[in-house]
UniProtKB/Swiss-Prot annotation:
Function: One of the components of the core complex of photosystem II (PSII). It binds chlorophyll and helps catalyze the primary light-induced photochemical processes of PSII. PSII is a light-driven water:plastoquinone oxidoreductase, using light energy to abstract electrons from H(2)O, generating O(2) and a proton gradient subsequently used for ATP formation.
Complexes and interactors: PSII is composed of 1 copy each of membrane proteins PsbA, PsbB, PsbC, PsbD, PsbE, PsbF, PsbH, PsbI, PsbJ, PsbK, PsbL, PsbM, PsbT, PsbX, PsbY, PsbZ, Psb30/Ycf12, at least 3 peripheral proteins of the oxygen-evolving complex and a large number of cofactors. It forms dimeric complexes.
Protein name: Photosystem II CP47 reaction center protein
GO CC annotation terms, alphabetical: chloroplast thylakoid membrane; photosystem II
Species, as recorded: Spinacia oleracea
Residue ranges crossing the lipid bilayer per the database entry: 21-36, 101-115, 140-156, 203-218, 237-252, 457-472
Keyword Transmembrane helix: yes
InterPro entries registered for this protein in UniProt: PS_antenna-like, PS_II_antenna-like_sf, PSII_PsbB
Gene3D superfamilies in UniProt: Photosystem II CP47 reaction center protein
Lineage of the organism: Eukaryota, Viridiplantae, Streptophyta, Embryophyta, Tracheophyta
Length: 508
């Protein structure tokens, strides 16, 4: 039976034992990758500066997912929030990684067992002795078990009843920590940025899954529906499973890219929309204005801005600035952030405060334009000096820093003023170390961007897979010439193979 390479998976089509085996082996590979990747990331992760060099700047991918579920400590003696730990306990980052690797090994052995012992009695019909699977019953069992897991996660892990809780932070990603979360049963639970919705939705969805599972275990599908949806065909299971997976992938791509309580900015980095909308800039100005209203000086007001908040307001942390094929972490792009230089305030010779127009997300270069409080252009860095009217030299622009390392320092030299005006296009100004990692100065995306791109791409691919396999099972008689009501099953690898002349096409 010469199967082409793209149809080799049909060998498990009517072999439940080996179908289970290959799925267990797949689980072993996934769990093994997760544990190994976690150990690799822990080997290269630098926990020394959680403010200016957080996990998402270092390109960590699996550490943020462990952290949002309540893991914060390492056997190396450090905590993700900074400081040292004396007793991290079993469920540290390394402990979780090790558990995944051990689970992977057990799955590997189980896969081998099921491959060798494939012809089990449980796969045979008691009445006829022929191979058969009660797929609606199996669906009910799986739905019930997944409902129990979903309910347990929401009712115990997230709420802290039996578990650590989840990562919760303020709207500006400054005070994040792992804590128990109470379910939000009101309308606020539908706000994607309310952590309580995670608990309540898992409890509700889990309850629904348990009830639906019990329903499918106790109620048989009508014959017309069973035949119409080909419920006796394992490819129907494949098609509907792919549908569930691609739907979930589309959903999480959205919650990651647009932001939600499940994707905190402290763990995955800010979203592009927070730059586009000046989200952090507005909060910084609000805090400064409040300080000035309390009779603080500019220097005092700006010095009270958390460095963490200022760092979010920097275009280099925008996940949409990274090119699609630029490999590496953000630190490999613009460098490792060392310190905030402070907020530059530009003034012309008449004393007007000027604001540098910020670079939009999808621009690589952008003209340096300084406007006043009314939006009128007062200064720029001209492309052609011969025709300039608003150059820094002509307008007499100066810059003074408030807060940060250059607090109180002012410059009137045009070359220096223009240098900081160019850098102010990119948000708050930071000193960046490019030497340590040989950073090339080209922006990279954060794990938020990678996750979104990967899941959106695979969701699209799996959508077509759902259409393909759904069509194959619904129109099997048209595509393969096989009677859709044919329920005869023979040994694995020798039945229902397109292109195989030995496949029976009609029931006797």
């Amino acid at each position: 039976m010469g199967l082409p390479w793209y149809r080799v998976h049909t060998v498990v089509l009517n072999d439940p034992g080996r179908l289970i085996s290959v799925h267990i082996m797949h689980t072993a590979l996934v769990a093994g990758w997760a544990g190994s990747m976690a150990l690799y990331e822990l080997a290269v992760f630098d926990p020394s500066d959680p403010v200016l060099d957080p996990m998402w700047r270092q390109g960590m991918f699996v550490i943020p997912f462990m952290t949002r579920l309540g893991i914060t400590n390492s056997w190396g003696g450090w905590s993700i929030t900074g400081g040292t730990i004396t007793d991290p306990g079993i469920w540290s980052y390394e402990g979780v990684a090790g558990a995944h690797i051990m689970f992977s090994g057990l799955c590997f052995l189980a896969a081998i067992w099921h491959w060798v012992y494939w012809d089990l009695e449980i796969f045979s019909d008691e009445r006829t002795g022929k191979p058969s699977l009660d797929l609606p019953k199996i669906f009910g069992i799986h739905l019930f078990l997944s409902g129990v897991a979903c309910f347990g996660f929401g009712a115990f892990h997230v709420t802290g009843l039996y578990g650590p809780g989840i990562w919760v932070s303020d709207p500006y990603g400054l005070t994040g920590k792992v804590q128990p979360v109470s379910p939000a049963w009101g309308v606020e639970g539908f706000d994607p940025f309310v952590p309580g919705g995670i608990a309540s939705h898992h409890i509700a969805a889990g309850t629904l899954g348990i009830l639906a599972g019990l329903f499918h275990l106790s109620v048989r599908p009508p014959q017309r529906l069973y035949k119409g949806l080909r419920m006796g065909n394992i490819e129907t299971v494949l098609s509907s499973s792919i549908a569930a997976v691609f739907f979930a992938a589309f959903v999480v791509a959205g919650t990651m890219w647009y932001g939600s309580a499940t994707t905190p900015i402290e763990l995955f980095g800010p979203t592009r929309y927070q730059w586009d909308q000046g989200y952090f800039q507005q909060e910084i100005y609000r805090r400064v204005s409040a300080g000035l209203a309390e009779n603080q000086s500019f220097s005092e007001a700006w010095s009270k801005i958390p460095e963490k908040l200022a760092f979010y307001d920097y275009i280099g942390n925008n996940p949409a600035k990274g090119g699609l094929f630029r490999a590496g972490s953000m630190d490999n792009g613009d460098g490792i952030a060392v310190g905030w230089l402070g907020h530059p305030i530009f003034r012309d010779k008449e004393g007007r405060e000027l604001f540098v127009r910020r670079m939009p997300t999808f621009f690589e270069t952008f003209p340096v334009v300084l406007i006043d409080g009314d939006g009128i252009v007062r200064a720029d860095v001209p492309f052609r000096r011969a025709e300039s009217k608003y150059s820094v030299e002509q307008v007499g622009v100066t810059v003074e820093f408030y807060g940060g390392e250059l607090n109180g320092v002012s410059y009137s030299d045009p070359a220096t003023v223009k240098k900081y005006a160019r850098r102010a296009q990119l948000g708050e100004i930071f000193e960046l170390d490019r030497a340590t990692l040989k950073s090339d100065g080209v922006f990279r995306s954060s794990p938020r961007g990678w996750f979104t791109f990967g899941h959106a791409s695979f969701a699209l691919l799996f959508f077509f897979g759902h259409i393909w396999h759904g069509s194959r099972t619904l129109f099997r008689d048209v595509f393969a010439g096989i009677d859709p009501d044919l329920d005869v099953q023979v040994e694995f690898g020798a039945f229902q193979k397109i292109g195989d002349p030995t496949t029976r096409r009609q029931g006797v």
